[in-house]
Design a protein with these regions (language model features):
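Sec-dependent bacterial lipoprotein signal peptides
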Residues: 1-17
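Generic low-complexity segments that are intrinsically disordered, proline-rich and/or Lys/Arg-biased
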Residues: 3, 8, 26, 58-59, ...
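Hydrophobic alpha-helical segments, principally membrane-spanning helices and signal/leader peptides
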Residues: 3, 22, 154-156
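Hydrophobic transmembrane signal anchors and adjacent membrane-proximal interface regions, especially
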Residues: 3, 49, 66-69, 140-145, ...
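Residue-level signal for the start and early helices of compact helical domains
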Residues: 7-10, 25, 32, 68, ...
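N-terminal export/targeting and maturation segments
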Residues: 19-91
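Extracytoplasmic electrostatic interaction patches
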Residues: 84-180
Length: 180
């Protein structure tokens, strides 16, 4: 094999494996996980809202989040994150709690799928719909929807950035976000 082909093959292998899509969990799998572990999800939410603008795990030992969490809560968070296979938790300081479950893509484009507790989400989507009514070109850049349909299937209808939400119950949703 000519030596000039080696760099090409190395780049090809990295691109092939780096761009391969991970197995994103289906809505059905995520709904089943939530229904089997609802009390644990609620416990994660309850711990998160105790701390202002909270995220976990902390970025490193010097991160202020590492210092504000009680030892008891930290131990419980670690246990729940492991049990539920959650990557990270974030609380916006107002009402929304985000539990990151799966990510894909590269730094300039990609997406994620998460559980979100958002009791005011319908108001947020209503405001988005008003914005679209005033300027229909908004949907050329981003689409935001609440739907009972499978989020993976709905996402295939759009080639723009999307924020899709599927209701679970009591303010909980599955959230699929994709940035193009």
């Amino acid at each position: 094999m000519p030596k000039s082909l080696i760099p090409f093959l190395i780049v090809f292998v990295f691109l092939f494996f780096g761009c391969a899509r991970n197995n994103m969990p289906s809505d059905h799998q995520m709904l089943e996980n939530f229904n089997l572990n609802e009390s644990e999800f609620e416990r994660l939410r309850n711990i998160s809202v105790k701390y202002d603008r909270f995220y976990y795990p902390p970025y490193d030992e010097t991160d202020s989040t590492a210092y504000i969490i009680s030892y008891k809560d930290k131990k419980e968070l670690d246990s729940l994150i492991k049990k539920l296979d959650i990557m990270s938790i974030q609380y916006d300081g107002i009402s929304e709690v985000y539990l990151l479950f799966h990510t894909w893509g590269i730094s300039v484009s990609g997406g994620y799928k998460e559980y979100i507790y958002a009791p005011n989400l319908e108001d947020k989507i209503e405001n988005y719909n008003k914005e679209v009514a005033l300027d229909p070109t908004t949907e050329m850049y981003i689409v935001e929807r609440i739907t009972e349909e499978d989020l993976d299937q709905v996402s295939q209808r759009y080639s723009v950035s999307i924020e899709l939400y599927r209701p679970i119950k009591n303010g909980w949703y599955i959230h699929l976000s994709r940035e193009n």
